[in-house]
Regions:
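Alpha/beta enzyme core
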Residues: 2-228, 234, 238-267, 275-285
Length: 285
């Protein structure tokens, strides 16, 4: 199983690594079997699973629910739970409680939190209690209103210096890695070279130690214009649409279900008493 020590070793050995989001049992199982070393149960589930316009409405209960499902599906990947908006902002005590839920209730191995500044103190407290922490700097979606929207961060010298300082502070606080989102490539490379811990980029160019994408973006499940940093490796939205339309047509014209999908009471054919143990998950509604 991948551990935080393995992630550190990736950087030391110059081994680039992939991270993907996972929000449910089947996606986690599939990605785990594909060998993805880190799965992030991101608060982005609010947008791609729950239909919210931002991540802000996502609650800790939402996150724990999905994280539990991911934990049931993945057994080799390092599992990281994303602390949602207002689950760690009120106090250090609140942060401890929220992070503890991810570890105790949901079976996560680590937590992610956004921002620098006072978040550094929270990161230090959590790591001191044995809870591994992944930082997140640059375009931090929980600060979307303060940033005036989803905009690239760190373009000015002042912003860049602040991101670098926050990254060093998070490393000092004990974070095992840092996500750099929506920052110029040269800044991400500079931060990566300045740190002993790995950086994970999303919209941060090729100079980070690892890369992360939202699963639904990578699979082409999200529609409309994708952000510049997204590469769609397939287009499942089109595939699903085509399959659903074909299914509906076959039901309508009576070609589905055919004999091969039906049970028979004829003794020479399939026994009338179906072998329920042969019915895999997903076969029964």
């Amino acid at each position: 199983m991948t551990t935080v020590l393995d992630v550190q070793r990736f950087k030391e050995e110059g081994q680039r690594f992939a991270v993907l989001t996972a929000y449910d049992y089947l996606s986690a199982k599939t990605l785990d079997e594909a060998g993805i070393p880190i799965l992030l149960v991101g608060d982005s589930l609010g947008m791609v699973m729950l239909g919210y316009p931002t991540t802000l409405p996502v609650t800790m209960d939402d996150m724990v629910h999905h994280a539990k499902a991911v934990c049931r599906g993945a057994h080799q990947a390092l599992l990281v739970g994303d602390l949602p908006f207002m689950s760690y902002h009120a106090s250090v005590e609140q942060a401890i409680t929220s992070a503890g839920r991810f570890i105790q209730e949901a079976g996560m191995h680590a937590v992610k939190l956004e921002g620098g500044g006072r978040v550094v103190e929270i990161a230090q407290t959590l790591t001191g209690m044995g809870i591994p922490v992944m930082g997140h700097l640059g375009l931090t979606p929980q600060f979307v209103h303060q940033m005036g929207g989803f905009k690239v961060q760190g373009k000015s010298d002042k912003q860049a210096a602040m991101i670098l300082a926050d990254a060093k502070a998070l490393e000092q606080a004990g974070a095992f890695s840092i996500v750099l989102e929506g920052v110029p490539s040269d800044l991400a490379t500079r931060v990566t070279k300045a740190l002993r811990i790995p950086t994970i980029g999303i919209g941060a160019g090729p100079g980070t130690d690892g890369q992360v994408l939202v699963l639904h973006d990578m699979l082409g499940l999200t529609t409309g214009k994708a952000p510049k940093f997204v590469k769609r490796y397939t287009n499942l939205a089109e595939e699903i649409t085509r399959a659903a339309q074909t299914y509906a047509k076959e039901v309508g014209d009576g070609t589905f279900p055919g004999p091969e999908h039906s049970y028979s009471s004829n003794g020479s054919a399939t026994p009338a008493k179906a072998k329920l143990d042969e019915m895999k998950y997903g076969s029964s509604v």
